[in-house]
Amino acid sequence: MGSGGVIHCRCAKCFCYPSKRRIRRRPRNLTILNLPEDALFHILKWLSVGDILAVRAVHSHLKYLVDNHASVWACASFQELWPSPGNLKLFERAAEKGNFEAAVKLGIAYLYNEGLSVSDEARAEVNGLRASRYFSLAERLNVGAAPFIWLFIRPPWSVSGSCCKAVVHESLRAECQLQKTHRASILHCLGRVLSLFEDEEKQKQARKLFEESANQGCLTSSYLLWESDRRMDMLDPGRCLHSFRKLRDFAAKGCWEAQLSLAKACAHGHQLGLEAKASSEIVCQLFQASHAVNKQRVFSVQKGLNDTMRYILIDWLVEVATMKDFSSLCLHLTVECVDRYLRRRLVPRYRLQLLGIACMVICTRFISKEILTIREAVWLTDNTYKYEDLVRMMGEVVSALDGKIRVPTVVDYKDVLLTLVPMAPRTQHLCSFLCELSLLHTSLAAYAPAHLAAAALLLARLTHGQTQPWTTQLWDLTGFSCEDLIPCVLSLHQKCFHDDAPKDYRQVSLTAVKQRFEDKRYEEISLEEVLSYGQLCAALGVKQESLEPAPFLSAGDIHAFLSSPSARRTKRKRENSLQEDRGSFVTTPTAELSSQEETLLGSFLDWSLDYCSGYEGDQESEGEKEGDVTAPSGVLDVTVVYLSPEEHCCQESSDEEACPEEACGAQDTQALVPGHQALRTPGPEPPLCSRWGLGKDVTTSGYSSVNSASPTDSGRTSGGPPRSTSELPTGSSLNTQPCHHHARKSCLQCRPPSPPESCAPQQQVKRKNLSAHSEEEEEDMNLGFLKL
């Protein structure tokens, strides 16, 4: 009963139960650990080994995945990490799990005794056996590329004592005799090594190894055997036809060299039973299978790199190739390797020259008989880098490129065209000149290599006033009409002849390609008069548009790069000198010797520059006899001559005193150069986790190194933001009119007089370099290969 005598019922109006409180459940926190294992594997793949160790320490489940799944280690990145006693277990584990990069770096580290210290006693034998193990593993993991490990153990070998290269070769041979599978590529590598000896017995052994390798399915060995038998097969019509059928089979399976040979063989298609149309279709398929690769992506990956820096690097590589007389193919392959590496991995500016010379060392070993030795390559950089720096960069390049050294280049397609359509020698030289000029400009890479080669040929024929610059035969062979080539021809002409070449910090234009083709064997084709832009447009039948030269960065906008200052340089003038002052216009500077310097050096410099080349200078992996370190010693003496007594006394001596070690029965004397060490900016070190530690590799090479003694020019500052010089010319939007096939007159330009020949060539010596040298591809590198 309520108040006032009112009786309340228990209805909803009179009585209210307390409302129930609903408790909200907290949402479940999802973490990376809740992802399926397949998703976790995709996350862990391609991480650096330091990141993998850091993730491993986070949770027991992640630790279980890292420790028990080989795919994590097979894809781990060892970029900028070199084997050392502190991280050896990590490299070994990754290599055994199928990591190509770890296997390559371990093989090179043991072969050159770099980073992994081994006692002097039986060093070559121990290192050779270990290197052969990891080289064999790397070759098995090498999928889709030609066998490559032979380039590290190719001759020369030491003639006395134990040689690490020879130990690797014998160990691999013993392995092939024991194993019945996975031997084809190893047998090919063994055959390539023996084929480089001039001994007739070794040549026979090499052929036997190639035959065994071909029987086990090695396509490269099959092609080499075909090439060696080609001359004999051509004498018999029946054998010739059978040989051609084998070549077509090799080309259909993807052998690039076989595809090139097949296209060139179509020049004699009637002898092979081929009609003209069938021959043209084979060549046309090769050209149409070529695709462009966007080299502008280099600058999106390399934030500190611009087109001028790349131009300077390539110009210097051209100069080295000219000095060493390397082929155009070797030069083009070197540049391709540089660009492919720059698209995949970040490179500081001070290591660009190291990257370039490392790529040249690799490419000369892969395709040339005369090679660039490691010690000579170090000397060519003015000792900016040490011996071990170059060895490690070679490992970085080969692993980053997955062992794929040989790729299609512009010069390959150019050679096919010049074989199929005979032309005057000067037209051939001009076409080659244009192809090498195209290496300097990344904007021209917007065109496929085959397209660029065809455009270079068309421009060469136009320049030489051909009645029909682009014949129906050339159209049928390439699949490109004259109208298809017009944009590329105009771009090529603008970049090669209209735009100004960049200058170094000495205000000297970089013209190494032009100097290369001023040689008499090229009939001094680079001195020839060229068509003006207006004459070219008239010859092509297109509307002329005004063009402005694309400015390159000036010396005030960029640090000194791959060049040395001309200050404190002595020069001796001679009458009838072929090069009055080579140091004033070359990218890798030289200084002529004064009378005092010539007296000090005598004939030592001539011997050092001439002898240390090719096979006889390639003792870098085994050590050289005392006195065999040639060019760096000459640089040392002249550097001291340039210094005043006060400067000389104040300089610090190198930390690395001469400590000769025996390897392959020979000894090295380390070049001790007084001066400041070039600065190195170490990258961030990966974290240390669990029982594995990465650690910083403080171990130097077991072989004596050539010291770096280039001081850093840190006082220079960069200017404003660089402007890209790789834009296509405005003439790309064209009024395409029919191409008129009639002769055109050349532009009348002043031709510089030929310099007088020198009866007594000057002695030259390199000056010290006073400046610190400072993505994965979206397409498979086999993209340019013909698929039949």
Swiss-Prot record:
<dbReference type="InterPro" id="IPR013763">
    <property type="entry name" value="Cyclin-like_dom"/>
</dbReference>
<feature type="domain" description="F-box">
    <location>
        <begin position="29"/>
        <end position="76"/>
    </location>
</feature>
<keyword id="KW-0195">Cyclin</keyword>
<keyword id="KW-0206">Cytoskeleton</keyword>
<dbReference type="Pfam" id="PF00646">
    <property type="entry name" value="F-box"/>
</dbReference>
<feature type="short sequence motif" description="D box 4">
    <location>
        <begin position="351"/>
        <end position="354"/>
    </location>
</feature>
<dbReference type="InterPro" id="IPR048258">
    <property type="entry name" value="Cyclins_cyclin-box"/>
</dbReference>
<dbReference type="Pfam" id="PF00134">
    <property type="entry name" value="Cyclin_N"/>
</dbReference>
<dbReference type="GO" id="GO:0051726">
    <property type="term" value="P:regulation of cell cycle"/>
</dbReference>
<dbReference type="GO" id="GO:0010826">
    <property type="term" value="P:negative regulation of centrosome duplication"/>
</dbReference>
<dbReference type="InterPro" id="IPR004367">
    <property type="entry name" value="Cyclin_C-dom"/>
</dbReference>
<feature type="domain" description="Cyclin N-terminal">
    <location>
        <begin position="291"/>
        <end position="405"/>
    </location>
</feature>
<dbReference type="GO" id="GO:0019005">
    <property type="term" value="C:SCF ubiquitin ligase complex"/>
</dbReference>
<dbReference type="InterPro" id="IPR011990">
    <property type="entry name" value="TPR-like_helical_dom_sf"/>
</dbReference>
<feature type="compositionally biased region" description="Polar residues">
    <location>
        <begin position="723"/>
        <end position="738"/>
    </location>
</feature>
<dbReference type="GO" id="GO:0005814">
    <property type="term" value="C:centriole"/>
</dbReference>
<dbReference type="Pfam" id="PF02984">
    <property type="entry name" value="Cyclin_C"/>
</dbReference>
<feature type="compositionally biased region" description="Polar residues">
    <location>
        <begin position="700"/>
        <end position="716"/>
    </location>
</feature>
<comment type="function">
    <text>Substrate recognition component of a SCF (SKP1-CUL1-F-box protein) E3 ubiquitin-protein ligase complex which mediates the ubiquitination and subsequent proteasomal degradation of target proteins. The SCF(CCNF) E3 ubiquitin-protein ligase complex is an integral component of the ubiquitin proteasome system (UPS) and links proteasome degradation to the cell cycle. Mediates the substrate recognition and the proteasomal degradation of various target proteins involved in the regulation of cell cycle progression and in the maintenance of genome stability.</text>
</comment>
<dbReference type="GO" id="GO:0016538">
    <property type="term" value="F:cyclin-dependent protein serine/threonine kinase regulator activity"/>
</dbReference>
<feature type="region of interest" description="Disordered">
    <location>
        <begin position="700"/>
        <end position="788"/>
    </location>
</feature>
<dbReference type="InterPro" id="IPR006671">
    <property type="entry name" value="Cyclin_N"/>
</dbReference>
<keyword id="KW-0539">Nucleus</keyword>
<keyword id="KW-0597">Phosphoprotein</keyword>
<dbReference type="InterPro" id="IPR036047">
    <property type="entry name" value="F-box-like_dom_sf"/>
</dbReference>
<dbReference type="GO" id="GO:0000082">
    <property type="term" value="P:G1/S transition of mitotic cell cycle"/>
</dbReference>
<dbReference type="GO" id="GO:0005634">
    <property type="term" value="C:nucleus"/>
</dbReference>
<dbReference type="GO" id="GO:0000307">
    <property type="term" value="C:cyclin-dependent protein kinase holoenzyme complex"/>
</dbReference>
<dbReference type="InterPro" id="IPR001810">
    <property type="entry name" value="F-box_dom"/>
</dbReference>
<keyword id="KW-0498">Mitosis</keyword>
<keyword id="KW-0832">Ubl conjugation</keyword>
<feature type="short sequence motif" description="D box 3">
    <location>
        <begin position="349"/>
        <end position="352"/>
    </location>
</feature>
<comment type="subunit">
    <text>Component of the SCF(CCNF) complex consisting of CUL1, RBX1, SKP1 and CCNF. Interacts with SKP1. Interacts with CUL1. Interacts with CCNB1; interaction is required for nuclear localization of CCNB1. Interacts with CCP110; this interaction leads to CCP110 ubiquitination and degradation via the proteasome pathway. Interacts (via the Cyclin N-terminal domain) with MYBL2/BMYB. Interacts with FZR1/CDH1 (via N-terminus). Interacts with RRM2 (via Cy motif and when phosphorylated at 'Thr-33'); the interaction occurs exclusively in G2 and early M.</text>
</comment>
<dbReference type="GO" id="GO:0031146">
    <property type="term" value="P:SCF-dependent proteasomal ubiquitin-dependent protein catabolic process"/>
</dbReference>
<keyword id="KW-0963">Cytoplasm</keyword>
<feature type="region of interest" description="Disordered">
    <location>
        <begin position="566"/>
        <end position="585"/>
    </location>
</feature>
<dbReference type="GO" id="GO:0005737">
    <property type="term" value="C:cytoplasm"/>
</dbReference>
<dbReference type="GO" id="GO:0048471">
    <property type="term" value="C:perinuclear region of cytoplasm"/>
</dbReference>
<comment type="similarity">
    <text>Belongs to the cyclin family. Cyclin AB subfamily.</text>
</comment>
<feature type="short sequence motif" description="Nuclear localization signal 1">
    <location>
        <begin position="20"/>
        <end position="28"/>
    </location>
</feature>
<keyword id="KW-0131">Cell cycle</keyword>
<dbReference type="GO" id="GO:0016567">
    <property type="term" value="P:protein ubiquitination"/>
</dbReference>
